């Protein structure tokens, strides 16, 4: 292809030069034909000069165009050379591609064999993975059994140690219980003896005073509430009651005053010896909360006294007050059965 292009360029150049030659020959023939043959004429130098200058200009333009064509031909030649080199490279690459395409069937066969080997390897890998998982399960079971055995041994040792500690603690508790039981029994016996002694002394004092004076003056011999006898001795609830109704209290005062005048007539010596500032004995009815919270007092103790200026109460009047107090106490116990039950329980525990 390039050779034909070069041949065409050379033929164009030859045609161009041959055309120039023919033009020059025709111009010469025209000059020769244009001369008159019959009558000679004088040469005109100015016309020749113009014609020569015209020819020179034409030849200069032709030479310039020929040079431009030569430069363009050289440029085209260089481009053609570069194009030929490029096409040579492309031809070599096409040849290589053709050779590689010819090798494709063999490559496909190799790929098929590789795929088959990969499938076989995949199956073998799955089998190995299953075997490894089974081995891991076996190892885990062995480790679990070993851990179970260790924990069982540890549990047995812990049970033995705790059993020994429990036996020692039981023995210690048994010794402490026996010791405390002995101490409790001893203290209970001491309390019972002291209580019996206190009752005997109180009863003896009451009997002596009653035999000497004919009435009981309990307020003078009242123990403090914080003493042992007032806190631990079971006291009759009748000695802690007080008549809270004002009308009943006034009627009782009138009755007691009338009874006191009779007693003054019967025993004037006793009235002179008694202190006029002494308070009369009153029966206080405790509320359920107070009866549950207050500790029992001694059997010879009584409640607080009312205002002074009242005569002392004789034994006959005490029986009247006790009867009225029993009625009120019976009604209170019916209304509050829990308090009486608590007092009975306290009495039973103290008797024990």
UniProtKB/Swiss-Prot annotation:
Entry similarity comment: Belongs to the dysbindin family.
Pfam families: Dysbindin (PF04440)
GO cellular component: asymmetric synapse; axon; axon cytoplasm; BLOC-1 complex; cytoplasm; dendritic spine; endoplasmic reticulum membrane; endosome membrane
Biased composition (Low complexity): 286-301
Region ranges (Disordered): 267-352
Disruption of the gene: reported phenotype: Null mice exhibit cognitive abnormalities including schizophrenia-related behaviors such as impaired working memory under stressful conditions. There is higher acoustic startle reactivity to stimuli. Pyramidal neurons are hypoexcitable on dopamine-2 receptor stimulation. There is reduced expression of Ca(2+)/calmodulin-dependent protein kinase II (CaMKII) and CaMKKbeta in the medial prefrontal cortex mPFC. There is increased expression levels of cell surface dopamine receptor D2 in cortical neurons. Expression levels of SYN1 are lower in both cortex and in the hippocampal formation (HF).
Motif (Nuclear export signal): 243-256
Comp. bias intervals (Polar residues): 274-285
Keywords: Albinism, Cell membrane, Coiled coil, Cytoplasm, Cytoplasmic vesicle, Endoplasmic reticulum, Endosome, Hermansky-Pudlak syndrome, Membrane, Nucleus, Phosphoprotein, Postsynaptic cell membrane, Sensory transduction, Synapse, Ubl conjugation
Summary of subunit composition and partner proteins: Interacts with AP3M1 and TRIM32. Interacts (isoform 1 and isoform 2 only) with the DNA-dependent protein kinase complex DNA-PK; the interaction phosphorylates DTNBP1 in vitro. Interacts directly in this complex with XRCC5 and XRCC6. Interacts with XPO1; the interaction exports DTNBP1 out of the nucleus. Component of the biogenesis of lysosome-related organelles complex 1 (BLOC-1) composed of BLOC1S1, BLOC1S2, BLOC1S3, BLOC1S4, BLOC1S5, BLOC1S6, DTNBP1/BLOC1S7 and SNAPIN/BLOC1S8. The BLOC-1 complex associates with the AP-3 protein complex and membrane protein cargos.
Post-translational modification: Ubiquitinated by TRIM32. Ubiquitination leads to DTNBP1 degradation.
Top-level division of the source organism's lineage: Eukaryota
Role: Component of the BLOC-1 complex, a complex that is required for normal biogenesis of lysosome-related organelles (LRO), such as platelet dense granules and melanosomes. In concert with the AP-3 complex, the BLOC-1 complex is required to target membrane protein cargos into vesicles assembled at cell bodies for delivery into neurites and nerve terminals. The BLOC-1 complex, in association with SNARE proteins, is also proposed to be involved in neurite extension. Associates with the BLOC-2 complex to facilitate the transport of TYRP1 independent of AP-3 function.
Protein's gene: Dtnbp1
Keyword Ubl conjugation: yes
Official protein name in the record: Dysbindin
Expressing tissues: Detected in brain, in hippocampus and dentate gyrus neurons. Detected at axon bundles and axon terminals, notably in the cerebellum and hippocampus. Detected in neuropil in hippocampus, lateral septum, basal ganglia and substantia nigra. Highly expressed in pyramidal cells of hippocampus CA2 and CA3. Detected at the heart and skeletal muscle sarcolemma (at protein level). Ubiquitously expressed. The highest expression is observed in testis, liver, kidney, brain, heart and lung. Expressed at lower levels in stomach and small intestine.
InterPro entries per UniProt: Dysbindin (IPR007531)
Disease connection: Defects in Dtnbp1 are the cause of the sandy (sdy) mutant phenotype, a model for human Hermansky-Pudlak syndrome (HPS). Sdy mice lack dysbindin expression; they have a characteristic sandy coat color and have much fewer melanosomes in the retinal pigment epithelium and choroid. They are fully viable, but present behavioral abnormalities. They have prolonged bleeding times due to platelet storage pool deficiency, and lysosomal storage defects. The number of electron-opaque platelet dense granules is severely reduced, and the platelet serotonin content is strongly reduced.
Modified residue annotations for Phosphoserine: 11, 315, 340, 343
Ranges for region Dysbindin: 173-325
A Gene Ontology BP annotation from the UniProt entry: positive regulation of gene expression
Coiled coil (UniProt feature): 88-176
């Amino acid at each position: 292809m390039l050779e034909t292009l070069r041949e065409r360029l050379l033929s164009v150049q030859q045609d161009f030069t041959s055309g120039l030659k023919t033009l020059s020959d025709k111009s010469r023939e025209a000059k020769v034909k244009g001369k008159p043959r019959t009558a000679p004429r004088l040469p005109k130098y100015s016309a020749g000069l113009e014609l020569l200058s015209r020819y020179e200009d034409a030849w200069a333009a032709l030479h310039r165009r020929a040079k431009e064509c030569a430069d363009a031909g050289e440029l085209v030649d260089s481009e053609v050379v570069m194009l030929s080199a490029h096409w040579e490279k492309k031809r070599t690459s096409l040849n290589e591609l053709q050779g590689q395409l010819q090798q494709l069937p063999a490559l496909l066969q190799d790929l098929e064999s590789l795929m088959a080997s990969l499938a076989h390897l995949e199956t073998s890998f799955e089998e190995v993975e299953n075997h490894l998982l089974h081995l891991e399960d076996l190892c885990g079971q062995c480790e679990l059994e070993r851990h179970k055995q260790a924990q069982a041994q540890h549990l047995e040792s812990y049970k033995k140690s705790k059993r020994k500690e429990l036996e020692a603690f039981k023995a210690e508790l048994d010794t402490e219980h026996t010791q405390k039981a002995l101490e409790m029994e001893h203290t209970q016996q001491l309390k019972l003896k002291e209580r019996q002694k206190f009752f005997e002394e109180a009863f003896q004092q009451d009997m002596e005073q009653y035999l000497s004076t004919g009435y009981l003056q309990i307020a003078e011999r009242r123990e403090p509430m914080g003493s042992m006898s007032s806190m631990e001795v079971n006291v009759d609830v009748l000695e802690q009651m007080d008549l809270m109704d004002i009308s009943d209290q006034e009627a009782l005062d009138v009755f007691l005053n009338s009874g006191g005048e009779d007693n003054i007539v019967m025993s004037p010596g006793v009235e002179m010896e008694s202190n006029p500032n002494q308070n009369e004995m009153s029966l206080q009815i405790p509320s359920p909360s107070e009866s549950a919270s207050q500790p029992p007092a001694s059997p010879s103790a009584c409640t607080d006294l009312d205002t002074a200026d009242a005569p002392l109460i004789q034994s006959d009047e005490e029986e009247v007050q006790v009867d009225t107090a029993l009625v009120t106490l019976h009604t209170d116990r019916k209304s509050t059965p829990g308090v009486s039950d608590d007092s009975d329980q306290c009495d039973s525990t103290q008797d024990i």
